[in-house]
Amino acid sequence: MMASHAESTARLRLGVVGLGRAFTLMLPTFLADRRVQLVGACDPREQARRQFERDFDAPAYETIEDLAADSNVDALYIASPHQFHAEHTRIAAANRKHVLVEKPMALSLDECDRMIADCAEAGVKLIVGHCHSFDTPYLRTRELIGSGEFGAVKMIQALNYTDYLQRPRRPEELSTAEGGGAVFSQAAHQVDVVRLLAGSRATRVRAAVGNWDPARPTEGAYTATLWFENGAFASITYNGYGHFDSDEWMDWVGEMGKPKNPEAYGGARRLLQQVQTADEEARLKAEGTYGGTRYVSPSPTDDATAFQHFGPIIVSCEGGDLRPMADAVMIYRPHSRDRMMLERPTVPRSEVIDELYLAQFYGVTPLHDGEWARDTLEICLAMLRSSEEQRDITLGVNVEDTQWRENPSS
């Protein structure tokens, strides 16, 4: 069942918890998708609250408690810092609001379990996203796998090289113990995608993480192998130190589905060189997000030309290879090579609204529910532990590890 943008008459009244970077990335979706109406928000920054009230003629509160109590709100989009996700979900559920919470779902499996229980007890839906496993190229690739034409998935290769760690960050974003670093922020995407494509439960993880910039004391890179119950395995690699850009291998289409100028190389590092202290860096980040002095509102004509993505991926099946791109899926059969074009997106990240809308108005259980996101977090935690202990980690058997919390720079 799919409620299209044109066919839908009822609108989902959404409140936003946190008007920072995540909201900035979702805002083009909220503006373009007629199934959604932004009816409220909360943020500790007065400038962001004022801009929201101007832009949407809707109240902006200082606390989530006030927003959650607003009877005009159907669901809450929780885009607050990672360490607040569990508590903010509890407050939303206590007020009978459906929940769309950003990845990672939380920072521990206990927090995930409480979030799932809180929403179940309140009778509200819990969806975790946006995550790149929502992206249409991966969903279409999964459909091709499901057709049976290519046989079983045997191996998945996924990599992404970005400037993630060179972008302006708040102090907690550079602390693994507080949910910062590439594993919590970026592996949550990559693990989700390979889980979707493998179509099976992961059973074992072996990983190594990289932390080689003393000025950015958290993981900036990782590589891991995942094994699945169905016999498939996946290799995932990420590097956020801002040198090679793997969008070069995606036809110079950036993560957000827009053309990327290769001549802009090094822009994040140049911007970061403007600051000398952690406070200055945090201010620089705030200035570029919603309500900030450098924030640029999305233009109605600034449409993505392709779907969003998370770097090059190749799925090797028994009878062929599949390579999801930003605008197509490359299909490699035994005697032919084809490019299956995808219809250009009209609304970025509309796949997230699909799940939220169907959950709200039709009671459909979402794919990216709490249990799904908990399993992704379990793998991320296992990656940290595997790297620390230099061994394989079996999933489902006490993967939580506290050592990285005590010494996040190790």
From Swiss-Prot:
Pathway: Xenobiotic degradation; phthalate degradation; 3,4-dihydroxybenzoate from phthalate: step 2/3. SUPFAM superfamilies: Glyceraldehyde-3-phosphate dehydrogenase-like, C-terminal domain, NAD(P)-binding Rossmann-fold domains. Keywords: Aromatic hydrocarbons catabolism, Oxidoreductase, Plasmid. Pfam families: GFO_IDH_MocA (PF01408), GFO_IDH_MocA_C3 (PF22725). Induction: Induced by phthalate and repressed by glucose. GO terms for molecular function: nucleotide binding; oxidoreductase activity. Disulfide bonds: none annotated. Transforms 4,5-dihydro-4,5-dihydroxyphthalate to 4,5-dihydroxyphthalate. This is Putative 4,5-dihydroxyphthalate dehydrogenase. The lineage of its organism: Bacteria, Pseudomonadati, Pseudomonadota, Gammaproteobacteria, Pseudomonadales. The gene is pht4.
